[in-house]
């Protein structure tokens, strides 16, 4: 199956997670600013973004992209992942709810989050997410 891994990263933490997801999926990995394909052409999509500000996704590049994905998310399997520095992961719960409301199935039932730099356990979970998406 054709899988895309698309992310925004400010410090490199979410980028490391994205690379692990892509490795697990055997998929290409794109920073959202560099992605020029059509996400509708993919069977599964992994989206990564850290928590920003008051636990929201990055607003200048990732938010508009996610809004675009919502338009055709129905019936798609979408994996979500990201890092955070504070809070309790509310941004990810909100993101999961948003994708489900758009009709998507959230891979693995929930997004993968890690505080700050992803440790080995978080990277293993990211690779497993990639494998799940590749099997869609």
Pin down the residues of each PLM region.
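FMN-binding flavodoxin-like domain, especially the glycine-rich phosphate-binding loop
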Residues: 3-4, 9-30, 34-37, 41-136
């Amino acid at each position: 199956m054709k899988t895309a891994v698309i992310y925004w990263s400010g410090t490199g933490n979410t980028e490391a997670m994205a690379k692990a997801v892509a490795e697990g999926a055997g998929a290409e990995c794109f920073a959202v600013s560099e992605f020029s394909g059509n996400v509708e052409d993919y069977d599964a999509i992994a989206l990564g973004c850290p928590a920003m500000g008051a636990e929201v996704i990055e607003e200048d590049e990732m938010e508009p992209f996610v809004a675009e994905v919502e338009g055709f998310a129905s019936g798609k399997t979408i994996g979500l992942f990201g890092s955070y520095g504070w809070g309790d992961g509310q941004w990810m719960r909100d993101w999961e709810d948003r994708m489900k409301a758009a009709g998507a199935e959230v891979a693995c039932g929930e997004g993968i989050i890690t505080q700050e730099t992803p440790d080995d356990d978080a990277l293993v979970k990211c690779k497993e997410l990639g494998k799940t998406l590749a099997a869609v």
